[in-house]
Amino acid sequence: GKRHQAEIVQRSYPVRIISVEDGDTFVGVADGGDTLTYNVYSIDAPEIDQPQGYEARKYLYNIVLQRRVEVTPKGGQTPCGVRVIATTRDNDDVADLMLRSGYAWYRNDTVNELRYIRSERFAQEEGIGIWAHPDNIAPWEWRKQHAKE
């Protein structure tokens, strides 16, 4: 019945990455042949036009391109794609890698994940990536400002 369907949707499955849009969005092909856009759950990377936006994309690209990642759907479709937790073949959490390298903000409105808080704090303390720019603004604020233009 309906419940059974929901369980199937939440199961993780492998995806072959074919392109990377920005620091938290990639396009991949699932085994069934469906090409979908995926958005990494619980982080927000700088937009391409923001400081470090290009670097964030490049970092994600280096982690995932031409590789398979396991994705686990989290809360459905967003305008940016299917929201997923993504793990690499080495079992690294993509969101955690992005936070730890200073290429994403942690969206604490999504999940209370101590590991993510620690990784973001590490990057802040090291002053790396987005944290090298004292005047950086969170992408969700940036999008608001630029939507008006």
Annotate each PLM feature:
Residues 1-149:
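Small beta-barrel nucleic-acid-binding modules, primarily SNase/OB-fold domains
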